[in-house]
Structures are given as structure tokens and as C-alpha cells.
Amino acid sequence: MQTVRMTTAQALVKFLNQQYVEFDGKQQKFVKGIFTIFGHGNVVGLGQALEEDAGELEVYQGRNEQGMANAAMAFAKQKHRKQIMACTSSVGPGSANMITSAATASANNIPVLLLPGDVFATRQPDPVLQQIEQTHDLSISTNDAFRAVSKYWDRINRPEQLMTAMIQAMRVLTNPADTGAVTICLPQDVQGEAWDFPSYFFQKRVHRIERRLPTKASLADAVEMIKRKKKPVMICGGGVRYAEAAEELKQFAETFHIPFGETQAGKSAIESSHPYNLGGIGVTGNVAANTIAKEADLVIGIGTRFTDFTTASKQLFQNEEVEFLNINISEFHANKLDALKVIADAKEALLALIDELQEIDYQSSYTVEIADAKDAWETELSRLHNIRFTCQDFTPEVEGHFNENLNEYVDALGTQLTQTAVIGQINTLLDKDAIIVGAAGSLPGDLQRMWASRKPNTYHMEYGYSCMGYEVAGALGAKLAEPSKEVYAMVGDGSYQMLHSELVTSLQENKKINVLLFDNSGFGCINNLQMGNGMGSFGTEFRYRNQETRKLDGAIMKIDFAASAAGYGVKTYHVTSLEQLQEALIGAKKQTVSTLIDIKVLPKTMTNGYESWWHVGVAEVSKNQSVQAAYESKVSNLQQARSY
């Protein structure tokens, strides 16, 4: 048997260079590159291996471990899970910073390979710098926290363990039904230890992502269910995009006259203008999709996890005869809502159903309902685009909260811009193939409802975990995946302040991204949530501490985000009017470096809910009558929802 004497880290790098995926007959490298932040826990081990021979891996320098791991996830998401980035960090806090990203990737079923440095396997220098000591179990390190949020976790305590660990890692990373974060912990001493690895460990490995076919029995059951139903509705989930099944979904909708709503992950699989595309569905959905969904007698979920936002906490579907048909590659997700399960690739399942349903000449019984619902939403959308603030008699979209306070915000922020009008103008002015990236705050709701996707795969929303601070790093990841397209991070001031470190990496790599920063000086959507459930405004506005009350109810904070970003070398713009916004968007397109447009918008001018409810933990007992009323409303709504 031929062997190669290498360190554990060198063997890992060589192995990663030999991984390929094949999908629909097309083969490509699986691991595009690796994000690094070096510390004592990885620099002389994995860092040495990368310096000596990185092979074809592109090595990137991150600025924050969570930021670079978010970028890696966004890269894989934009690549439809067919190519990934790895991430290496040092031991302790560097590793811990990636835990949030691991959770984000696993929640979204997006493959990311995390390689956190770890404490010494020998324990000789214990406690090493940045080591946690647990007196009840000395084998525990910070990296054990990854177990809860990883789809596969392993620790390499001996060099020869690398082989089985990485074979299993690739199994999970290339499995569409169970992919997510894979964490391989690398003790810093083991990274540098040598072993005689067999040559066959480094052979070219092609991981074929196969399309699972539906069984004849499940297909027959699905046909029987559909033919009994008159008003079905489909839900286009992220699985439609990852399975590249958009054309088949279009064909299914057009052939059988069945409309579909979009989840955040599924949006832009098909253009918004398609006659059967109702748009966003659920808590952050629009009036068209939610109105049709309420009356549907069959819900066909395609590649969706049926989160509470999609089902409106399982209260959206009000037809007493409604049933569920779930098409999903994952048996776990297909099993939800007591559904009839078709465990299969979305494309193959749709093609099989098309053949079977054409045999019986199936048609839904919709007449004008689909067109009427879309027309009603277009009318509402036009209204939202044209909302303008007036100092007197202005009623914000989220009314009853700040009606008397808005003039204070006008003065403090120097703006009269409404969020819906800003989104409308951005949607009009961006290139049709531009990619928008979002994750947290009020913007995901506005974008799922309002954004018109004019080209496929241009809407990139991380809403499986709604990770605050994902947006800027996510934009970098999307840009690395599609460097020829303009990429825009749609981010609020709250999320931007949590994390935007990879803006600097975008400059370093000459990968231009555009940050559209909506500043309403607060955590606006959570302010809406608390006040909408009977509370006052508490801890969600960005106000100075009042020296008299000792509370955060002083003057409104105004931050010059443009000036801050300019210090990095970003081209920046200040915007307080639609005219300035148009000039900034046109100017940003001409730039070759990353840009940031600091857009001051008024709170409470985002969209509100349409025909939906969200179950949150309202206080059962309170001295506040409005909280009591909110609890009673919760109980009433819960009675109309499924129990599971």
C-alpha cells in the first residue's frame, strides 16, 4: 500500500482539493475555497498547510468569524448547494463566533464546512490560552457547543481519524435531505502531527447528487388526493430552487390551473409576473396569496419546511376540508401537518404528477379568483409605492403606535421618507438580474410582499434562522458566487450595527457589494410586535438615556452610517428624499468599489400584515389592560389553528 507522510492539516487540504460533485451529468469542484481568521489555534497547523500548498483552494481573510461563516453559507445558498466554502478559526472565542453561523446553515439546510481549532488532545499545556475548563468533564471544550447546531460533528484526536471523519463530512455536505453545517474540530497539536496516509484517501471523489424518484404508491395516492380537490394551492419552497425545478413547477401550474405562493427561500425561483405566482405567503405574505390560501382545499408544499411564518402559525388554511400533500426530499419535513408524503426530488415528482394528472384531464375549478387576487394585490402595491408623509393627518401603515411621535422622527432624522416608497423605487431602478440579500428586521416582510423578482434566483433571503447581521456578509458570499452581477444588502440599522465586518473583506477582494441601509433609529419590527401585543415602546427605539427618568426615553439617536463606512474606503451616499435615492442608486452602479447608501426612513412606514396571524408568547397575566386584550386575542386565534 502506497502512503504519503503528511500532517493532519496538510492531508485535510489535499483531501478537500479532490472533492467534486455531479448533478444532472455536470461535474464541478465542490470546495471552492476557505475563509480564514488565524490565531494560535490554527495558524501553525492548518495555516502552515495552506501556505505550503493550498492546491486550487482560494484562501480568503475574514474579519469576524461569524461574518466569514455567514459569507460561506451565502455562497453555498446562491450556488444552490452545489459548491461550498470552508472556514477555519482559532480556538475558544474564534470558534464560538461561528456557532451562530452553524445554526443558520443547519436551519436552512445549506452546506458549510467549519474547521474550528481546538484545545490540545494531549492536554499537556492545559489550560491552554482561551480554553474553558469544565471540572466535571475535561474532554469538553468550546467546540462541543457546535454539537447542537451541526448536522455532523467530529473531533480529530488522532491524525488517522481524519479519514473516516472527512468521508462522513462529505456524505452530509452533499446530501440534499440532511445537509447543513458540518463541524470538524481540529486540536491544535493534532493539526501538526504527521501520519502515513494511504494514497487512496486522496483519490478524486465525485459525489453524485441524485434525483430521488417518487414511489408508484405515493404517486398514486397523490393523484387520488389531487383529483378530489377543486381549489388547490401550491407553496414554492427553497427546495424548488435547489432542485432546479422551476420550469416543472411552471408547467404544473399552467397545465392544471393551480396557483402558488412563495416562501422566503422559494421566492424568485419563478418571476413574480408569472400569472400563477401569487407572491409571498404567510405571516409576511401578501393579500393575494393569503386570501387564496384561506379557501384552498388542498395545500401542495414543494420543498418547504412549513415554518410558522409560512403557515401563519398553522392558522392560515381555514377551509374545513383542507388537506396537505408534501413533496420533499426530506422525510422529516414531508411528514409535517399530517400530510400525504411524496418523498422525492421536486423536479422528478412534478414531472411524474404532470404525466399522471394529464391522463385524467385534471383541472382545478378556479375561474377568476387567481387573476382577481393578483389584481387586488397590484392595486395595493401601487398604493404602498406612493405613500408620502404629510406632517398633519398622516396615518402610518402600522398605526396607533407612533402617530404623534412621527414628527419627532422627521426632525431627528431629517427625513420624510416612507419605507414602502423607498422599496418601490429601489425595485424599479435596480438591474433586472441584480441580487438582493436580506435576513432580519422589518425588511424581510416588506420584501417578501412587495419585491417583484424579474429574473430567476435574484432574491436571496436568509429567513430560516433570520440571523441578525447576515446581510452584509451574505452579500459578499452571493457576490463571490455570482461576480458578474450587482449584489445589494438590504439591511436595517439594527442588523447592520450587529455585524458588517465583511464589508472590509469585500474591499480587500475587489468584490463590489452595495449596502442599502434603512435607518429608522430602532429595532422597528420588534417595536411593532411589542406594541401590537399591548406593550408600550420599551427598549426597541434607539434613544439616549434620559437623565431625569433614567430610562432610554431621551432624544432620538442619529448615526451617520455613511461617514463611518467612508472610513473603510466605501463609496457612500446620504439619502433623505426619493430624488437623492435615485441619484445614489444610479451613482452606485457606476462605482467599482463597494458602496453604502444611508437611507433615513420613518418608523411605522413598513408594510403590516395581510390576512395572517403570528403566535407569540403573550403574557397570560398583566396589570395592563391592552396586554390582557392581546392575550385574549391570542387565545381566540389559537382556537382557529391546528394543534400541530
From Swiss-Prot:
Pfam families: TPP_enzyme_C, TPP_enzyme_M, TPP_enzyme_N. It is an enzyme of class 3 (hydrolase). InterPro entries: DHS-like_NAD/FAD-binding_dom (IPR029035), Myo_inos_IolD (IPR030817), THcHDO_hydrolase_firmi (IPR023757), THDP-binding (IPR029061), Thiamin_PyroP_enz_cen_dom (IPR012000), Thiamin_PyroP_enz_TPP-bd_dom (IPR012001), TPP-bd_CS (IPR000399), TPP_enz (IPR045229). Pathway: Polyol metabolism; myo-inositol degradation into acetyl-CoA; acetyl-CoA from myo-inositol: step 3/7. It catalyses: 3D-3,5/4-trihydroxycyclohexane-1,2-dione + H2O = 5-deoxy-D-glucuronate + H(+). The keyword Kinase does not apply. This is 3D-(3,5/4)-trihydroxycyclohexane-1,2-dione hydrolase.
